[in-house]
């Protein structure tokens, strides 16, 4: 069984004791019921991991001694998901699935046809919730890096961001059900980075699509079916994993299998 992962702010040196408390400690000791003698992996969320053995466990956390540390290189090319704000019941699902599928960063987008509207205090509240979902999903999928979540971008702000990304060598793909280009026909493997733009339930407005493509984005379709905004990014990330070198590593070379062979 693959060892469970929990995040800490700072990883101690090899031989030192790490204290896992707060939400992570509660999840490890109370929810997952990890006990002394068991091994787990701790991560700092930015690429460094440590194999540890638990020495003490209580209701609110545990103490574990670091056996070994290592760093995981970032996956290339990196993929940023621009997610238009879905309805509340779909919002967290979209971010959760995309994190598990490998998104490296998220940008929240207030598109014209969004039913949800984040303004004022809702911006901070929404971003905090998305970040919590991303952290949980990253832990569940054993990711060495917790994807950052930023926004909320207006359409003009997104258009400017797209223009900058394209100028820097990125491929920006707008997922659209009426696109004539297929994602498999885009030379994504040669791009320095990728950006996937996912519209809201009502779709991307024609003027928004025109502005994005004028800025250098390419409208693409994933396949013959129309996907929900909550599942589109995850499916696209799967396609990108196959079409680029992101999934080239064999099982024995994956960031997590690494702990069993060192």
UniProtKB/Swiss-Prot annotation:
One GO location term (cellular component): cytoplasm
GO BP annotation list: rRNA base methylation
Known EC number: 2.1.1.193
Cellular localisation: Cytoplasm
Catalytic reaction equation(s): uridine(1498) in 16S rRNA + S-adenosyl-L-methionine = N(3)-methyluridine(1498) in 16S rRNA + S-adenosyl-L-homocysteine + H(+)
GO molecular function terms noted in the UniProt entry: rRNA (uridine-N3-)-methyltransferase activity
Keywords for the protein's UniProt record, in alphabetical order: Cytoplasm, Methyltransferase, rRNA processing, S-adenosyl-L-methionine, Transferase
Main location class: cytoplasm
CDD domains hit by this protein: RsmE-like
InterPro entries per the UniProt record, alphabetical: Alpha/beta_knot_MTases (IPR029028), PUA-like_sf (IPR015947), RsmE (IPR006700), RsmE_MTase_dom (IPR046886), RsmE_PUA-like (IPR046887), tRNA_m1G_MTases_N (IPR029026)
Family: Belongs to the RNA methyltransferase RsmE family.
PANTHER family: 16S RRNA (URACIL(1498)-N(3))-METHYLTRANSFERASE, RIBOSOMAL RNA SMALL SUBUNIT METHYLTRANSFERASE E
General remark: Was identified as a high-confidence drug target.
Primary role: Specifically methylates the N3 position of the uracil ring of uridine 1498 (m3U1498) in 16S rRNA. Acts on the fully assembled 30S ribosomal subunit.
Protein name according to UniProt: Ribosomal RNA small subunit methyltransferase E
Organism encoding this protein: Mycobacterium tuberculosis (strain ATCC 25618 / H37Rv)
Taxonomic placement: Bacteria, Bacillati, Actinomycetota, Actinomycetes, Mycobacteriales
Gene name in the database record: rsmE
